[in-house]
C-alpha cells in the first residue's frame, strides 16, 4: 500500500524527523488560504499522487506570491500528471500539498528497503539527491552508500554518523542527521513499511537538515495491525479493478496484455503468464483466486477481467489441491452464464475431482476449449486471442 507525501511527513513528524510546515488542500481557494496561514515569501505547490518524478512532470512549482500560488494550484489541480512512474496515461491530481519554501544548500538522498538476502533492513544514502537519483544509481553506483542494520540493535549512533559523513553532512549538522536517520529507521520498523525514502533530504544555508519529501510503501499483509495506516488509503490512486478484486479477497494486478488469466496460487499464476508469453501472447492480468474460491468469487473474477476493453480471451488454469476442480467448474459455468461471456475461454484443470470438473464443463453446453497441459492451454488461448482458434 502506498500513501501520499503529506501523509508520509505526518508519520515522520511522529518519529522526530524535521519536515517543512505544510497543508494538504483539495481546491484552489484552499491552496491560497493555506499559503496565507503558513506565511512567508515563498511556497511550494506540490501535486499529491502515488508516483515519483512529479517535479520533472510539472507537478511541483515554487511560488513567490499568493497570485502565483493560485496560478500554479489552478494549473496542477485536476491535471493528468505524467511521470516515468505513472506510464503514458498519467495520474489525475486530486489534491495538493502547500508547503513553506526552504533554503536549499545541498540535496541528499536516504532510503530504506528490506534486503531479502541478508534478511535485514538496509539504509541507503547518497550525496546526490534530487530528481535524478535513479540516474545516479545507474551510472555512478559508488555514490550510494549502504548499511545493513542488525535488527537486535537498530541503527546505532556510530552507523548513522558514518553514513551521514559519507554523504557530506558537516560535523555541526551530524546530530540532526543522526536523528533523522534513526527516526526514519524507527518509522520503517514500527509501521511495517517495505520502502521508505526521503528525496531530497536537504542541508539548508544555516546548517539545518530537513526532509523535503517523504515516500512510504507498506506491507499489505501487515495492515491488519495498523488501522492508522489503512486510514491513509486513497482509493482514487489505485486501479479500480484491483480495488474491486480486494473486496472479494482476490489477488489481482492489471497488466497491458489481452489474455485474461484466472489461476489458483501465485506461483502457478506467474508460471501461467510466463507460458503465455513463451507462445507469443500477452497476459492482461495476474489473478490468484486462492485455495478457497467459491462460485461467487469466480463469477466476480470474470466480471473484473471482462471490464478490461482489451480482453480477447481468457485462460483458467487450476491445480486442484485444496481447491476442488468441480467447484471451479461450477464457478466457471455460472460466471460464463452470468456475464454472457463472448470471448474464447480455455480451461485446464488437474487434481482433486478433475474428472468430475471436466465432465461438468463438457456437459454445460458452453463453447469452452479444453486443454490437458499448461503448454497446450497457453498455445490454445494465444491462438484464440488472435482469432486463429
Curated annotation (Swiss-Prot):
Catalytic activity: succinate + ATP + CoA = succinyl-CoA + ADP + phosphate; GTP + succinate + CoA = succinyl-CoA + GDP + phosphate
Disulfides per UniProt: none
Primary role: Succinyl-CoA synthetase functions in the citric acid cycle (TCA), coupling the hydrolysis of succinyl-CoA to the synthesis of either ATP or GTP and thus represents the only step of substrate-level phosphorylation in the TCA. The beta subunit provides nucleotide specificity of the enzyme and binds the substrate succinate, while the binding sites for coenzyme A and phosphate are found in the alpha subunit.
Cofactor(s) it depends on: Mg(2+)
Pathway linked to the protein: Carbohydrate metabolism; tricarboxylic acid cycle; succinate from succinyl-CoA (ligase route): step 1/1
NCBIfam families cross-referenced by the UniProt entry: PRK00696.1, sucCoAbeta
Protein name: Succinate--CoA ligase [ADP-forming] subunit beta
Family per similarity comment: Belongs to the succinate/malate CoA ligase beta subunit family.
Native organism: Paraburkholderia xenovorans (strain LB400)
Domain ATP-grasp per the UniProt entry, residue ranges: 9-244
Enzyme nomenclature, EC number: 6.2.1.5
PANTHER family per record: SUCCINATE--COA LIGASE [GDP-FORMING] SUBUNIT BETA, MITOCHONDRIAL, SUCCINYL-COA SYNTHETASE BETA CHAIN
Molecular function, one GO term: magnesium ion binding
Binding positions for substrate per the UniProt entry: 264, 321-323
Recorded name of the encoding gene: sucC
Pfam assignment, any one: Ligase_CoA
Amino acid at each position: 500500500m502506498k500513501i501520499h507525501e503529506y501523509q508520509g511527513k505526518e508519520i515522520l513528524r511522529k518519529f522526530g524527523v524535521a519536515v517543512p510546515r505544510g497543508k494538504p488542500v483539495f481546491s484552489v481557494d484552499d491552496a491560497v488560504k493555506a499559503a496565507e496561514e503558513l506565511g512567508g515569501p515563498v511556497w511550494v505547490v506540490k501535486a499529491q499522487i502515488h508516483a515519483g518524478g512529479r517535479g520533472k512532470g510539472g507537478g511541483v512549482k515554487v511560488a513567490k506570491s499568493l497570485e502565483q500560488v493560485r496560478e500554479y494550484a489552478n494549473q496542477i489541480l485536476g491535471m493528468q500528471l505524467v511521470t516515468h512512474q505513472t506510464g503514458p496515461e498519467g495520474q489525475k491530481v486530486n489534491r495538493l500539498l502547500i508547503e513553506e519554501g526552504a533554503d536549499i544548500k545541498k540535496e541528499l538522498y536516504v532510503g530504506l528497503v528490506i534486503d531479502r538476502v541478508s534478511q535485514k533492513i538496509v539504509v541507503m544514502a547518497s550525496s546526490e539527491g534530487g530528481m535524478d537519483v535513479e540516474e545516479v544509481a545507474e551510472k555512478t553506483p559508488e555514490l550510494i552508500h549502504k548499511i545493513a542494520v542488525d535488527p537486535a540493535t537498530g541503527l546505532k549512533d556510530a552507523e548513522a554518523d558514518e553514513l551521514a559523513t559519507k554523504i557530506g553532512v558537516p560535523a555541526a549538522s551530524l546530530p540532526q542527521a543522526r536523528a533523522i536517520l534513526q527516526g526514519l529507521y524507527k518509522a520503517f520498523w514500527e509501521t511495517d513499511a517495505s520502502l521508505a525514502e526521503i528525496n531530497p533530504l536537504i542541508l539548508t544555508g544555516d546548517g539545518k537538515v530537513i526532509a523535503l519529501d517523504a515516500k512510504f510503501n507498506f506491507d499489505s499483509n501487515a495492515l491488519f495491525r495498523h488501522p492508522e495506516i489503512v486510514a491513509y488509503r486513497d482509493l482514487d490512486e489505485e486501479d479500480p479493478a484491483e480495488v474491486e478484486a480486494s473486496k472479494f479477497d482476490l489477488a489481482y494486478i492489471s497488466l497491458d496484455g489481452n489474455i485474461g488469466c484466472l489461476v489458483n496460487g501465485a506461483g502457478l499464476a506467474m508460471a501461467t503468464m510466463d507460458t503465455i508469453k513463451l507462445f507469443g501472447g500477452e497476459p492482461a492480468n495476474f489473478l490468484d483466486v486462492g485455495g478457497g474460491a467459491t462460485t461467487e468469487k469466480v463469477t466476480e473474477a470474470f466480471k473484473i477481467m471482462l471490464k478490461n476493453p482489451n480482453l480477447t480471451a481468457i485462460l483458467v488454469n487450476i491445480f486442484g489441491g485444496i481447491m476442488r476442480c468441480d467447484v471451479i467448474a461450477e464457478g466457471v459455468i455460472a460466471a460464463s452464464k452470468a456475464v454472457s461471456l463472448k470471448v474464447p475461454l480455455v480451461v485446464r484443470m488437474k487434481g482433486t475431482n478433475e474428472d468430475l470438473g471436466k465432465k461438468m464443463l463438457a456437459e454445460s453446453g458452453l463453447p469452452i476449449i479444453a486443454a490437458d497441459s499448461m503448454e497446450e492451454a497457453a498455445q490454445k488461448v494465444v491462438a484464440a486471442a488472435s482469432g486463429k482458434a
